[in-house]
A protein has these predicted regions:
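Accessory carbohydrate-binding/adhesion or oligomerization-edge regions at the termini
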Residues: 203-294, 322, 353, 387, ...
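Exposed beta-strand and adjacent loop surfaces of beta-rich binding modules
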Residues: 177-180, 310, 336-338, 408
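Short beta-strands within extracellular/lumenal beta-sheet-rich domains
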Residues: 291-304, 373-375
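A short beta-strand element within beta-rich, extracytoplasmic domains
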Residues: 307-333
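Beta-strand-rich ligand-recognition modules
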Residues: 326-327, 332-409
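Flexible, acidic glycine-rich loops studded with aromatic residues
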Residues: 91-228
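Short beta-strand segments enriched in hydrophobic/aromatic residues
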Residues: 145, 305, 317-319, 392-394
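Active-site neighborhood of glycoside hydrolase catalytic domains
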Residues: 2-87, 92-96
């Protein structure tokens, strides 16, 4: 990456990359890279930096090309005209493909921010660069994994970032083309069951889970069936910044609520993980079209179990990005906003958090904050219908403890080892078999 993201280069060589001395060193490094890697392309970066030397990028592009390589560069980044670069890599919402320059689309493809169940829906449904098929200007797509935070187990890269499920989702979309929208359409929310888009995702999910059981057997594959998991979610009640404030759904489940002169409805959602507001705010839609700070939502469903049984539970209310310095919740709390969970009116307590530090640092690894990074919670399901009730307050969308607040929930019953969804369960907010 050049000339930005280069503080380590400066510490090591005591020269800025854009200086004459820095450019000489870079060319020596490029010599070694080009000799070592027998690949047709080399990505040189150029994003998130102030350019102080207008000759830097053109000279580096020319040098890499002189080594027989084609050059890729970020967009946004250095601005090129056709012929001045071989390919651009679109990394943010502002990235735009340019006629005459092939582009790679990886906007919103950052696995380090993905949750377990919501983001894969958007990834699978989304057209690549909102195009039905590739062209001379749209070369394809890439998934990115920026794991800025220290890891103490390399398999955490695979399981917490959902590498294999998302890899299969993007591979199918890139191979087949198509898709139903871009990320800014329905976003992470599954469409209604009677739509072709839902049926396509359900078919993909079925085939993906076959690959989990066969092709990826023995590998960490953090995904279970979610297209059968149905919820009722209320409109959000204004809490005035009081996360503990009690609202009518805590007294009685109804289709409509009247509170302080206003009417609050209930709508259905499908999925084991639901974003009420996405990590990227309104860029990627969640359940609420216009989510507001200082509100409290409720989600509930009934789960039919064919027998009394002990099962596992995946539950989380802030999926921790792997590139952030966010602090783990305080012991006994699910998050910093006061989320709570009940099964059959019995409150489910949190696991014991293994990360207890209170100083934000990229050099301290995540603990068991994310539900797939720990053993499922052991819970009991009665024979018959079981009530699952969630309280989901939100304060501000920015807070000191977690930089990127995700107003969300993940709740699904799994086998005690976390490998599969519990068979024979029916998730129905209306108790319909």
């Amino acid at each position: 990456d050049m000339p930005g993201h280069s503080a380590a280069f400066v510490r090591a060589f005591r020269h800025d990359m854009q200086s004459p001395e820095g450019m000489k060193i870079l060319k020596l490094l490029l010599d070694e890279v080009c000799e070592t890697f027998d690949v047709p392309y080399l990505h040189i970066g150029t994003d998130e930096v102030e350019f102080t030397n207008p000759h830097f990028v053109p000279e580096m592009v020319a040098y890499v090309r002189s080594k027989g390589k084609k050059v890729i560069s970020w967009n946004p980044g250095w601005h090129y005209k056709p012929g001045e670069i071989d390919m651009t890599h679109l990394w943010s919402y502002r990235g735009k493909a340019q006629p005459g320059i092939p582009a790679i689309d990886s906007k919103f493809h950052y696995l380090n921010h993905f949750d377990v169940f919501g983001d894969i829906v958007a990834l699978y449904n989304s057209r690549i660069y909102d195009q039905a098929e590739g062209s001379e200007d749209i070369a394809g797509t890439i998934l990115a994994l920026w794991h800025d935070r220290l890891i103490d187990n390399e398999w955490n890269l695979v399981i917490e970032n959902g590498l294999y499920p998302n890899m299969l989702a993007i591979a199918e979309r890139a191979w087949r083309g198509g898709g139903t929208e871009y990320f800014d359409g329905l976003g992470t929310i599954l469409p209604p069951e009677d739509t072709e888009a839902f049926k396509e995702f359900a078919d993909f999910e079925k085939r993906m889970l076959w690959h989990k059981e066969h092709t990826f057997k023995g590998y960490p594959f953090a995904y279970v069936k979610q297209t059968n998991v149905k919820w009722n979610i209320t409109d959000a009640f204004p809490n005035g910044g009081d996360m503990d404030k009690v609202f009518p759904p805590e007294q009685e489940l109804k289709d409509t609520y009247h509170y302080n002169g206003n009417t609050y409805g209930v709508r259905q959602a499908i999925g084991a993980g639901i974003y009420l507001r996405h990590v990227w705010g309104t860029f990627v839609p969640g359940f609420y079209a216009d989510p507001k700070e200082d509100h409290t939502a409720y989600a509930y469903t009934w789960v039919y179990s064919p027998r009394d049984q002990e099962v596992g539970l995946w539950a989380e209310f802030q999926n921790y990005s792997r590139s952030e310095m966010d602090l783990a919740p305080l012991q006994g709390k699910w998050d910093y906003t006061g989320s709570r969970l009940w099964i059959n009116d019995r409150e489910i307590m949190t696991p014991v958090w293994t990360a207890t530090h209170q100083v934000k640092s990229n050099e301290i690894p995540l603990g068991n904050e994310n539900c797939v990074a720990r053993s499922p919670l052991a819970v009991h399901l009665n024979k018959g219908w079981n009530k699952v009730f969630l309280k989901l307050p939100i304060g501000k969308f920015k807070m000191a403890e977690t930089r990127l607040v995700k107003w969300m929930f993940t709740t699904v019953f799994v086998t005690p080892d976390g490998e599969k969804a519990v068979e024979g369960l029916i998730y129905s907010p209306d108790k319909q078999k």
